[in-house]
UniProtKB/Swiss-Prot annotation:
This is Uncharacterized protein AF_0576. It comes from the Archaea.
Amino acid sequence: MMRHVFGMSAEEAKFELRRVLERLGFQVKEMDSEILAEKGSKAVRISLKELGRSELNIPQTEVVFECEEEIYRSILERLRLSRMGG
């Protein structure tokens, strides 16, 4: 289980994560504050929890990944590239 804090709302984080998972070839199912994704024998479960706003008034969302570390790294790498316009 890996934790990460995103500087965005839970809805925005859910949208970005869904987009990345679909690009990685996963079949994605969204629930209220969770994303479940499968690709063959690989599975990903992502839980989102809004933490409020930072001192700079930026929304923060805690994201908990339950998956293989390789998949976790792939997701974060794709997010970094997409958020930087790459």
